[in-house]
Amino acid sequence: MATFFGEVLSVYSRAVEEDEYEDMTNENEEDEQIRREIEEKRSVEVCWLLGSQDGPLQCSDLIIGAGPNASGFIRAYLLSTVGWTAVAWLSFWNERSRGSERPTVVPGPGEPSCVLYRLESCPTVLICQCQGFVAEDQLFQFTEKVFSCVQTRDLNVTILSDCSSADYKTSDYLSGSSTPFLRCLKTSTYTHTVTCPPLEQPNICSGLAAAVLSHCQVHQISAVLYQCYSDVLHPDSASMQMFAATLSSVLKLEQSLSADVLQRVTRVSEIQSNLYT
């Protein structure tokens, strides 16, 4: 075929085209297999501790604690008292988990975990204590799994979370004496009285707390998020005590009983955060 000088012609070779197609097919199959393995490894599963569970648990109030101070408060003020039974736990793995595989046995005390507890004297009150890091790509699935454990009809959800005061945006000077403090966000269906001012713009919530609140808003579940802003990196008693008033309408807290446990929780955290110990 005649052409002008310097023109580049595409030369078609059926053998070359077929080889490239086979290579691309093999690569796609390998990529797909790797993707499935990663998804399986990072999936979230509910493990029941009650034997065979036919359906979701009856629940009127669900308390979810996410973050060091929130989970520490639940441990000191609630789980330290008698009458709570572990009913389920969530098995998941990510880059911050210990080991290289998703756990198959319930984590021991002090290990990263997410456990669902039920109050024996009032079985419709449940607590979800999350002491492990949930990756961003796991938040949606994690939230779906938590709410699959409970009946959502006439459900009230209280979310406890904590955040660094350095992330709080305000036009006024934020002194150390003004921390810790609480701010709240609620869904449109939440009609109960809140115990602190609402979170001002342009502040936002993120992580597991935001995922749970968004899920409740979409599914029209009554929910409120209480976020504690603190200038201390590890759990401390002052920050934990900020959550006490948020549960006054749901549970009666034993202040004197939790004092010793509260000291143990903060003491362990201080030892772990000390680089010179």
UniProtKB/Swiss-Prot annotation:
Q: Where in the cell is it found?
A: Cytoplasm; Endoplasmic reticulum
DNA repair as a keyword?
A: no
Tell me how the protein is altered or processed after translation.
Degraded by the proteasome upon completion of 20S proteasome maturation.
Q: Which residues form the signal peptide?
A: none
Indicate where this protein is primarily found.
cytoplasm
GO BP term, example? chaperone-mediated protein complex assembly
Q: Which GO terms describe its cellular component?
A: cytoplasm; endoplasmic reticulum
UniProt KW keywords: Chaperone, Cytoplasm, Endoplasmic reticulum
Q: Which domain of life is it from?
A: Eukaryota
A Gene Ontology molecular function term of the record: proteasome binding
The record's section on Pfam families has: PAC1
Give the protein's biological function.
Chaperone protein which promotes assembly of the 20S proteasome as part of a heterodimer with psmg2.
Quaternary structure and interacting proteins, as annotated: Forms a heterodimer with psmg2.
**What family classification does the UniProt entry report for this protein?**
Belongs to the PSMG1 family.
Question: What is the protein named?
Answer: Proteasome assembly chaperone 1
Its ancestry begins with: Eukaryota, Metazoa, Chordata, Craniata, Vertebrata
Q: Which gene codes for it?
A: psmg1
